[in-house]
Amino acid sequence: HRHSAYISQSGRCFYCNFPMWESDAVSYSQVHKVTLPQAKQFRCTAEHLDAGSDGGKDKATNIVAACIWCNRKRHGRKLAPSPKDYRELVQKRLRKGRWFCRELLTRFSDVIQMAQSE
């Protein structure tokens, strides 16, 4: 289901809207002119909108593609916010330039501009 979500989202993270990669971090780092450690933050993961621990099913309607950074940050909290609330939080922080390091925010300024227009 992850790959289907990745395709339907045009390879962009459900939360931050940054481009992701599925299998080749090296190519991603070269294309986007970021370091390999930075590229690894954008590995595509399957994100369950309703967590399995909360009864969420492993089916396409419950899975979106999210970069590993956003996925880990969401689930690293004591209580994971709803996908809608978390997406709003991520977009708000992007608009303020506070989600990724300044270098990544500069590299992907087009994504930030899209977030500001929403």
Spans of model-derived segments:
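Short Cys/His-centered divalent metal-binding micro-motifs
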Residues: 63-86
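The −1 position to Zn-ligating cysteines in a subset of zinc-ribbon hairpins
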Residues: 12, 45, 66
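Histidine-centered nuclease catalytic patch
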Residues: 20-63, 78-80
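Short, charged surface segments at domain edges that flank catalytic/cofactor-binding sites
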Residues: 1-33
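Acidic, metal/cofactor-coordinating or nucleic-acid-engaging core segments within structured domains
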Residues: 78, 89-105
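Short flanking/linker segments adjacent to small metal-binding domains or redox-active Cys/His motifs
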Residues: 72-76, 105-118
